């Protein structure tokens, strides 16, 4: 089970939003590269970056901070990024800079042809981000709810060749209410590619619950507010996940 620390970037700083609201941002660090180093030193095996300004602007807005993070840890672990990725040129720029994966969210839902082109051009590097509330997909930084069922879109995107899916339960993100395990497993069982859970991770029991369903295709979980607020000790959580994986593998 991959525990993936999130570094959300707003105006060059590492922040956390409450339910996607740019006006409800808590600044956790003015040095995102130092934050990346901290998580890697604590045992992170992948990082999840979000360009929040980019997500709302539709184009890269935190390049300097992203490049600083890649300079710091990009040679050591894979780094993935979402937010504002709307063109093949942007993807190419990011991958050339050292990102391992780019996450396409709103653009995948609104313009499936773009996602298909991206999967063809950058095979193995494209992750789809599906944000949902009550099983329905949301777009545009969560401000718009669509009529699309998450599972239907996930199957379609799997056929395009996406590497994996980051699934966020909007109702729980940044609220420390616990991961929506049932919805995540349902999605993972419906597709043959890995699913990364996101939204609401709050404590060690959440990690333990996710490890129990890893066999269904839940590859990892994005750790956000809980590791910044201190509700979850990242190093202890990764250690526990590794212990559980060992126990399950030996069972």
Curated annotation (Swiss-Prot):
Question: Per its UniProt record, what InterPro entries does this chain match?
Answer: Aldolase_TIM (IPR013785), His_biosynth (IPR006062), HisA_bact_arch (IPR006063), Isoase_HisA-like (IPR044524), Isoase_HisA-like_bact (IPR023016), RibuloseP-bd_barrel (IPR011060)
Q: Where in the cell is it found?
A: Cytoplasm
**Stored SUPFAM superfamilies:** Ribulose-phoshate binding barrel
Q: What is its EC number?
A: 5.3.1.16
One annotated Gene Ontology cellular component of this protein: cytoplasm
Catalytic activity entry: 1-(5-phospho-beta-D-ribosyl)-5-[(5-phospho-beta-D-ribosylamino)methylideneamino]imidazole-4-carboxamide = 5-[(5-phospho-1-deoxy-D-ribulos-1-ylimino)methylamino]-1-(5-phospho-beta-D-ribosyl)imidazole-4-carboxamide
Q: Which GO terms describe its biological process?
A: L-histidine biosynthetic process; L-tryptophan biosynthetic process
According to its UniProt record, this protein's enzyme class is: isomerase
Q: Which UniProt keywords apply?
A: Amino-acid biosynthesis, Cytoplasm, Histidine biosynthesis, Isomerase
GO MF term set: 1-(5-phosphoribosyl)-5-[(5-phosphoribosylamino)methylideneamino]imidazole-4-carboxamide isomerase activity
Q: In which pathway does it act?
A: Amino-acid biosynthesis; L-histidine biosynthesis; L-histidine from 5-phospho-alpha-D-ribose 1-diphosphate: step 4/9
Q: Where is the active site?
A: 8 (proton acceptor), 131 (proton donor)
The record's section on NCBIfam families has: 1-(5-phosphoribosyl)-5-[(5-phosphoribosylamino)methylideneamino]imidazole-4-carboxamide isomerase, PRK13585.1
Which family, according to UniProt? Belongs to the HisA/HisF family.
Matching HAMAP family, A to Z? HisA (MF_01014)
This one is known as 1-(5-phosphoribosyl)-5-[(5-phosphoribosylamino)methylideneamino] imidazole-4-carboxamide isomerase
């Amino acid at each position: 089970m991959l525990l993936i620390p999130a570094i959300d970037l707003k105006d060059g700083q590492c922040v956390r939003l409450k339910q996607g609201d740019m006006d409800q941002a808590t600044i956790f660090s003015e040095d995102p590269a130092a934050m990346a180093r901290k998580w890697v030193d604590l045992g992170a095996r992948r990082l999840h970056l979000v360009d929040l300004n980019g997500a709302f602007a539709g184009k890269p807005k935190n390049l300097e901070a992203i490049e600083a993070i890649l300079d710091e840890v990009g040679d050591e672990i894979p780094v993935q990024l979402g937010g504002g990725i709307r063109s093949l040129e942007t993807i190419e720029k990011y991958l050339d800079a050292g990102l391992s994966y780019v996450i396409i969210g709103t653009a995948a839902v609104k313009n499936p042809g773009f996602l298909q082109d991206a999967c063809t051009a950058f095979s193995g590097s494209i992750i789809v981000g599906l944000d949902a509330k009550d099983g329905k997909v949301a777009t545009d930084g969560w401000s718009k709810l669509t009529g699309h069922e998450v599972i239907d879109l996930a199957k379609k995107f799997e056929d395009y060749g996406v590497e994996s899916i980051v699934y966020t339960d909007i109702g729980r993100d940044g609220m420390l209410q616990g991961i929506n395990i049932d919805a995540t497993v349902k999605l993972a069982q419906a597709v043959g590619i890995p699913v990364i859970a996101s939204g609401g991770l709050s404590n060690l029991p959440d990690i333990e619950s996710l490890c129990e369903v890893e066999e269904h295709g839940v590859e990892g979980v994005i750790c956000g507010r809980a590791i910044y607020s201190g509700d979850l000790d990242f190093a202890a959580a990764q250690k526990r996940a590794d212990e559980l994986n060992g126990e399950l593998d030996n069972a």
